[in-house]
């Protein structure tokens, strides 16, 4: 390749709207390549490139990075790379060796990065890490493949993706086959978002209650139900949210598809799919999810978990709702079943109060003060309300059409037959740590 020109004490090349300056440079006429060295600066109308060494082709207008390089645009975006190229004409770039892209709102890095600036598309391959800098809605997304759409403000992660939603000291870790996030305000233009009408929970049973065992069960066969008829089945409601009040344009929503696993210190869950919106702070779990809270396993067709101040506040389970808790180290299980279950959490994330409505059933293994079993309560009614203490049932209230009795622990009592419909103790698939959801243990 014939070298036609060299400068050693400063030079400048102007090509259309691109200006390149450096201390030294070599120009090769046959290939139309210019190699710039020392204090290299490329200036364009939309940004700058600073580096120590740069190859530039005057025909293709492709800049090739061969040393540590900093790229800045006029919108505040910064790219740091050590190897790659940028096509000025096509507005595309390929970057290698764990380049970093960041601005005031996020940072992202990966082994390889492909950027299409004209269409606002980017792909990050190999150990990609996205970090949001939003203090209120902060999250991290980690995967072997992340695709972003700047025009739509969306992110999709695949290939062992992990989402970390920052919730103070108790962050939520989520994995699935595919993770996706976007802006709520954009979603509302095209989709119906499932909403929940608040179902009132009568906590009057809690007033004046001390720690009592199940033998003090309150039987209120003729009392008025605390939840109106039909309110449970119709509690899940799809609402066209175009009529909602103005939505904060920064609010995010998250979706997870297939093999969803969730871990936090206070709660764990598995399911088929998930939707979470920053607008109402509700985790929606679909297709027979299972949720664990301390000693309790809760399952159903659909589960809605409400957060307040970034902590679990209440839980709604719709259709085939079942709560199970193992009695200490025994092979016995306390159970509550109904068409729906509503639960409240205390400040530590443990179930504090629970109601089961619609063909509600309850199995409870009563113990005395020395933890000796005294019998099994088997009851059913229209509505069952349960008080918990330290995550364990302490008092039960039955409302309307009460039926049941206390069975002996031995004799004719078949404990397997006492397991309610859909009973399945699934502690073996419960995520025990944030590492479990990644390794599949």
Task: Give the location of each predicted region.
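Structural signature for solvent-exposed beta-strand/loop edge elements and short helix-capping sites
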Residues: 1-441
